[in-house]
């Protein structure tokens, strides 16, 4: 597991700015001398940086059937990078990390994010790693939307995109389901307007209902 602090400001679509942020990521396979064999994996809504192999808890990565020696995303050939997006709860800067200014969890004060914000953050990591072009950007569902956004925002940085189970926009039904899930979590008595982490609480009943 790798941890990189991005020190350049990231201006978000909502108008707010992250003056700096951290990104957690894992790598598989070796980066070649020309740095031209890098593949980016973009995770779905509840995914994270752990894409292949077993983590410290013995859990297989979500792409374990596809990433590895001799597998479709062959790590004998490719250098695979899988990150946890900002705003997630798996280590990258987000509601579950500490906002150093007040010294508390970001919680509900963390800015709203859009797909383009994740892609811009990923591009900043790409620059830190001195990778000029992705051989491929791959993602499913919400990750597929990120792969699509890469092709729109940075077409010269992507040789190919693999977009799985993703569309250009959500249907009204999908938006409605997500809103029901959101309200289920917010209705939990432990949600506390999103500040539950600073109070040592977990809205587990609302989350169970939402999922």
Model-derived segments and spans:
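Structured loop/turn residues at beta-strand edges in well-structured enzyme cores
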Residues: 16-19, 34, 76, 129-132, ...
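A short alpha->loop->secondary-structure connector
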Residues: 99-104, 157-158
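Catalytic-loop region of hydrolases
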Residues: 1-38, 55
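Conserved acidic catalytic loop of the alpha/beta-hydrolase fold
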Residues: 102-109, 116-136, 145
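Conserved hydrolase catalytic core segment
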Residues: 132-176
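Residue-level signal for well-ordered alpha-helical scaffold segments within enzymatic catalytic domains
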Residues: 65, 85, 124-128, 149
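Alpha/beta-hydrolase-fold enzymes
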Residues: 157-158, 163-211
């Amino acid at each position: 597991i790798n941890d990189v602090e991005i020190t350049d400001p990231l201006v978000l679509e909502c108008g707010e700015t992250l003056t700096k942020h951290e990104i957690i990521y894992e790598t598989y396979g070796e980066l070649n001398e020309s740095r031209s064999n890098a593949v980016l994996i973009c995770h779905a809504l509840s995914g994270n940086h752990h894409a292949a192999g077993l983590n410290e808890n013995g859990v297989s990565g979500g792409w374990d059937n596809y990433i590895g020696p001799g597998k479709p995303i062959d790590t004998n050939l490719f250098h695979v990078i899988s990150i946890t997006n900002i705003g997630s709860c798996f280590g990258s800067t987000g509601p579950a990390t500490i906002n150093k200014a007040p010294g508390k969890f970001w919680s509900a004060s963390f800015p709203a994010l859009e797909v383009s914000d994740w892609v811009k953050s990923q591009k900043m990591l790409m620059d830190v790693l001195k990778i000029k072009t992705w051989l491929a950007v791959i993602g499913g569902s919400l990750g597929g939307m990120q792969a699509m956004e890469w092709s729109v925002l940075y077409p010269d940085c992507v040789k190919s995109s693999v977009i799985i189970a993703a569309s250009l926009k959500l249907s009204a039904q999908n938006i409605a389901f997500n809103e029901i899930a959101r309200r289920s979590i917010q209705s939990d008595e432990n949600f506390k307007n999103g500040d539950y982490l600073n109070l040592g609480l977990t809205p587990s009943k609302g989350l169970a209902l939402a999922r």
